[in-house]
Structure formats: structure tokens, C-alpha cells
């Protein structure tokens, strides 16, 4: 049996913060009255994700049953059973994951960076309180230490209760869970500590904007060893090309190794896709497009939990961009 994770606590400010300018909720033919916790009635009905970050559109899921509703110190948390995507985790009215398609995001944000460098040993996860990224990092037998910093303990607890196949990563003995502000944790990390940093962040609006700006990336670069890598979620080419361009500019100013944009499909995310920014620090060269560190086929997790989405071919294909996105990103190279 795996040992329970080590847990440290902090009272610092949040990493995943409430989106003050969002309007999210549920459409229902029976009731649209807001409930005391700020969530609309969804029994029975449809959950709809609406935001000024994707104006003029919404994505809806048929709700079979609400399993959990709560309010943490930082955000509203809800879990419901959907008709077509299994259980769904919602934070502040925004879909974080579903049982059906979480594999695409979790596997790609993890294995794109970790399969691009030989023998990663120390990995930091910022955010990721559902445990899915931890589950995927644990597939790499070379990894000796996995630190995770998540602001909201309720997300961790709810994920363990309602998404055990995702939160299984917390049980790995290599994991140390830190409850606190990921930005502050990263600033306090000794220089050159990590081989890889994975930033599972919220969207860049409001206070979370700092997670996509130059000072944050400078903290990431400082915490990485020479030739170390970072992977952060980087929005949708269909909705946020202007944001992606700004991220590219900031990353090229900070990271003197490789800087690449990749993407994958996630049906329940806005526009049905999500992007990743992958960067490396100066040092041993990193070619993100051609993986050098395949996941061990004989790893114990492969037998019990085979990969559902990631493979070597889709790794390389993730860096193939449509012409409009390729031109926009190339225009920011100088």
C-alpha cells in the first residue's frame, strides 16, 4: 500500500482565484433562481458554462444528479453526475474536468514536458488539486520527488471522494502536498531545484493574470535546473489568440532554450480544445516535438491504468498548428 502524501499548510493568498467578471450557471425550465451559495438550480436541468472569455456561446451538459455543492474559502465547488460525460467537477461555475475526457488534458500537460527530457527526477505541480497530473507524473519511474502546491484543500478532499481514479495520484509516496499559494511557493523554492514545473492554472483574467506574465515565468525559470522544462495551460487558439501572443512574448524574453505552443482536444472545454506553452531554460537543448523519454511500458501503472490519450505520435502532432495560429506565433519571435 502506498504511503499517504506528506501535507504542508499555508495561509498565503490563492493561486486559483474567483473570476469576478464571470457569469456562470445553469439553465433550467423549472427554476433560474440563484441559490444561497451562488449556484443556480440544476435539478433537473442543464449546466451551462458562460463567460466573457468566450462571448456569444455556451457549453451545456445534462445534469442527472448533483453529488456535492460547497463553498470553500476561495471558490464555489460543485460535482454532478452528467448524462454523457460521467461525473463533472465545477469550480466557480467553470468546468474543470469530466470523467470522460479528463485524460486528454491530464496526460498531455504532463507527458509533453516529461517525455521531452531524459530521466526527470524532481517535478513541481502548481494547482492540479484534483490529482490527475500527479497520477500521470507518477507513471515516470525516474521521478523521485513530486511537489504539488494547491490553494484549496476542499478541491483535494472533494476529488478524493468523488474522483478516486483521478485523485489516486495523491497516494504515491513520492508526493508532498502543500496547501497554499503556488506563486509564493515557487518564489521560495531554491534556485535550480526542479527538472520540470507543470502549471495547471485557471484562465488569465482578474488576479490570475499574474500567472501568465513575465515575473511569474521568471520565478519558474529560477526554480528550474539548466535545461529544465515548464508546461502551462495556454488557452484556445480559436478564442484567445491575443492572449497566446502575449504569453509567447513573455516566455521568449525569459526562457533562453526552446519555446513552443502545443494543443489538444478536450470536448468540454470552450471551443473543444486547450493549448499548452512549453519552454526550457538555457542548458542542455530540448526538442519538445520529438520525445526522448518514453513512458516505461513495464511501469506498474500501465497495467492497471493504461494511457487513454497520449502516445508518441500524438506528442509530435500536438505541435502542428493551423496556418493562422502558426503565423501569429511566428510574428512574435523577434
Swiss-Prot record:
An annotated GO cellular component: cytosol
Which family does the entry's similarity section mention? Belongs to the spermidine/spermine synthase family.
Instruction: Tell me the domain of life.
Output: Eukaryota
| Name of this chain's protein | Spermidine synthase 1
Per the UniProt record, the source organism is Pisum sativum
Where are stretches of biased composition, namely Polar residues? 26-37
Q: Which residues bind putrescine?
A: 105, 200-203, 269
Q: Which HAMAP family match?
A: Spermidine_synth
Reported EC number(s) for this entry are 2.5.1.16
Which intervals hold domain PABS?
A: 44-281
Say yes or no: keyword Transferase present. Answer: yes
Q: Where, in this chain's numbering, is S-adenosyl 3-(methylsulfanyl)propylamine bound?
A: 75, 106, 130, 150, 181-182, 200
Catalytic activity reads: S-adenosyl 3-(methylsulfanyl)propylamine + putrescine = S-methyl-5'-thioadenosine + spermidine + H(+)
Assigned keywords, A-Z: Polyamine biosynthesis, Spermidine biosynthesis, Transferase
Amino acid at each position: 500500500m502506498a504511503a499517504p502524501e506528506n501535507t504542508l499548510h499555508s495561509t498565503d493568498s490563492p493561486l486559483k482565484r474567483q473570476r469576478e467578471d464571470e457569469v456562470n450557471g445553469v439553465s433550467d425550465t423549472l427554476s433560474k433562481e440563484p441559490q444561497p451559495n451562488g449556484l443556480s438550480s440544476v435539478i433537473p436541468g442543464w449546466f451551462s458554462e458562460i463567460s466573457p472569455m468566450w462571448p456569444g456561446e455556451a457549453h451545456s451538459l445534462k445534469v442527472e444528479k448533483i453529488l456535492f455543492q460547497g463553498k470553500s474559502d476561495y471558490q464555489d465547488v460543485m460535482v454532478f453526475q452528467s448524462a454523457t460525460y460521467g461525473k463533472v467537477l465545477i469550480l466557480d461555475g467553470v468546468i474543470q474536468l469530466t470523467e470522460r475526457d479528463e485524460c486528454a488534458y491530464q496526460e498531455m500537460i504532463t507527458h509533453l514536458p516529461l517525455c521531452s527530457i531524459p530521466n526527470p527526477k524532481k517535478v513541481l505541480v502548481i494547482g492540479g488539486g484534483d490529482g490527475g497530473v500527479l497520477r500521470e507524473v507518477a507513471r515516470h519511474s525516474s521521478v523521485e520527488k513530486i511537489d504539488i502546491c494547491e490553494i484549496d484543500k476542499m478541491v483535494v478532499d472533494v476529488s478524493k471522494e468523488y474522483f478516486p481514479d483521478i485523485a489516486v495520484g495523491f497516494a504515491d509516496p513520492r508526493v508532498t502536498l502543500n496547501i497554499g499559494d503556488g506563486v509564493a511557493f515557487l518564489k521560495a523554492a531554491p534556485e535550480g531545484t526542479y527538472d520540470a514545473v507543470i502549471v495547471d492554472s485557471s484562465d488569465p483574467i482578474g488576479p490570475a493574470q499574474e500567472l501568465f506574465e513575465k515575473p511569474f515565468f521568471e520565478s519558474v525559470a529560477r526554480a528550474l535546473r539548466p535545461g529544465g522544462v515548464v508546461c502551462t495551460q495556454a488557452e484556445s487558439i480559436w478564442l484567445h489568440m491575443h492572449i497566446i501572443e502575449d504569453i509567447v512574448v513573455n516566455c521568449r524574453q525569459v526562457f533562453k532554450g526552446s519555446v513552443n505552443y502545443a494543443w489538444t482536444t478536450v470536448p468540454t472545454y470552450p471551443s473543444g480544445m486547450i493549448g499548452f506553452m512549453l519552454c526550457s531554460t538555457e542548458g542542455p537543448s530540448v526538442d519538445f516535438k520529438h520525445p526522448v523519454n518514453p513512458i516505461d511500458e513495464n511501469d506498474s501503472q500501465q497495467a492497471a491504468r493504461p494511457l487513454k490519450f497520449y502516445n508518441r505520435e500524438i506528442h509530435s502532432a500536438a505541435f502542428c498548428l493551423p496556418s493562422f495560429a502558426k503565423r501569429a506565433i511566428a510574428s512574435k519571435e523577434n
